[in-house]
Amino acid sequence: MNAVQIDQLKQQFPLIETLQAYQETFWFNPHRYPLNEALAKVCLTEQDVKEAEARLARFAPYLAKVFPETQAQHGKIESALVEIAEMQQALSLQKHKTLTGKLWLKKDSHLPISGSIKARGGIYEVLAHAEKLAIEAGLLKLEDDYSKLDQDSFRTFFSKYQIAVGSTGNLGLSIGIMSAKLGFRVSVHMSADARQWKKDKLRSLGVNVVEYASDYGVAVEEGRKAAEQDPFCFFIDDENSTTLFLGYAVAGLRLKQQFEQKQIKVDADHPLFVYLPCGVGGGPGGVSFGLKLAFGEHVHCIFAEPTHSPCMLLGVYTGLHDQISVNDIGLDNITAADGLAVGRASGFVGRAMQQLIDGYYTIHDECLYELIALLNQTENIQVEPSAAAGMMGPYYVQTTPDYLALHQLSAEKLQHATHVVWATGGGMVPPDEMQKYLTYSQRN
């Protein structure tokens, strides 16, 4: 986009100036549709999500066999939901605003196998591809015990095929670990933002890591081009994959089960707010789709992005989606939240979910560091900077009168609200790297 086009855009969408100044902001979505209308625009259904859940159940015996850390949950890749009352109290003191309701942390940061939310979508898509190949070759039937996949004959079969992906880090880690375990050849195309330890981990598993000096968008595009040259290569497209999206969506059904176990009520008088860090959009978009299916109108899904990389907010706010990048408005797309360092949002997710997502806000890197230090201090939970982005959500909701009025959220309803911050990564961060994060946060 040229300067004239951007100036015209700013006249129509004044919030762009706030984004250009790297200021923190909250924008609630005035274009929310009634739930059934909005869900229909996604072009995926609850049945699709249930089929994804069934596929994960078929693979559970195999996962339990090859990843001992999943045995306690019988091969289910799921994270804990924990109340963080001390963190809530600390945030209230920090913001001089009593945050009402109950604050919970969804610890996808500590998901088994790869320690991030990407263990949902990334691993699911690899499993779906492996199942398809094995069934087509007559090696597997749906009714089989999938633990049979842990044999040299299957690893030899899968080694004929390659899987490729472009990533800022965590998606590549999830796909690389799972693909290598099955026997696939794997190439992960990584952007300049990717942490060195993630590259080292992948290489230790025999994964081909291709590094780029550019950002996420270039890594994805180059990965896609390379995959097109090899008929035996399957490219996992983080920007457009409905399979990835469905892998994430299963989380909505799972959270509902956890709520039932903990007897957490969600209805018109007991609203649920879920705050999700957003990069390209597949993870939070898929999870939000699952949440809307599970909890209906009573769940509010709010995305959090770095002030340097607000690609989804920019795309949805202007209606341009993947036709505009943060670079077009002069932002540098450089952030400590490496998992969120994405300049151009997924057009598929933006268009599919634009009538379902309730709000978007941006957050400074300095604030992310403060939040990971506070979470460590109050709850002894360690996450990476991007995973803390959702922590400011309750404050924005409760201090935005227009949002509360739009959704008829009275003070009494907020007293009975449940707030879930979705922690997206950090479980596999080496201890010395985590200490660097915490030391840096104490200096600032």
UniProtKB/Swiss-Prot annotation:
The keyword Acetylation does not apply. Belongs to the serine/threonine dehydratase family. DsdA subfamily. Its cofactor is pyridoxal 5'-phosphate. It catalyses: D-serine = pyruvate + NH4(+). This is Probable D-serine dehydratase. The gene is dsdA. SUPFAM superfamilies: Tryptophan synthase beta subunit-like PLP-dependent enzymes. Its EC number is 4.3.1.18. CDD domains: D-Ser-dehyd (cd06447). InterPro entries: D_Ser_am_lyase, Ser/Thr_Dehydratase, Ser/Thr_deHydtase_PyrdxlP-BS, TrpB-like_PALP, TrpB-like_PALP_sf. Pfam families: PALP (PF00291). One of its GO terms (molecular function) is pyridoxal phosphate binding. HAMAP family: D_Ser_dehydrat. One of its GO terms (biological process) is D-serine catabolic process. Keywords: Lyase, Pyridoxal phosphate. It comes from the Bacteria. The modification N6-(pyridoxal phosphate)lysine is found at residue 118. The keyword Flavoprotein does not apply.
